[in-house]
Amino acid sequence: SLVFNNLLLVLVIIFTPEIRHALESVGRSSVSKFNFFGFRSGAEEKRREEMQKMVNAVCRASSDMSDKHIGALMVFEQETILGDIISSGTVIDAKVSPEMIGNIFYPGAPLHDGAAVFRDGRICAAGCILPLTPNHDISSELGTRHRASIGMSEQSDAVIVVVSEETGAISVAYKGRL
């Protein structure tokens, strides 16, 4: 899906600034305005631009929270609908921005201990409770956020971005792997 592809791009962007620069250059070139069969539709181009804005916002927020050792748990819905997870939190339906993400996870904020769920390029809900992995072979050094990210990725096709409060490390869980 388009969201999954863009979230994979998040990983590359977060961990490799040189690749980010190259991708931004390609995105600005006129070549990106065409696809194999001709022009992209205006709606497709607008959606791609919106997804790119979301990716950039998540990257900036993740980097800022990492620098400040602020823990975060962000779930990006794919094909599996996460209705039960969303209903465990507070529905907010907010535009994605680094400031909004930072406010959600700011220590002491009402929703900071749960996960934020992203759907269709928006923050759908926050303060959501995720299932913990039942796997006992996971390192004892991993905290609850990481165990929840793995548990969520075992039960759905969601991509989960975790920022460690302890180390500031940014991790991604997908298909049961961190």
Question: Where are the language model's segments positioned?
Answer:
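Membrane-water interface of transmembrane alpha-helices in multipass transporters/channels
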Residues: 1-5
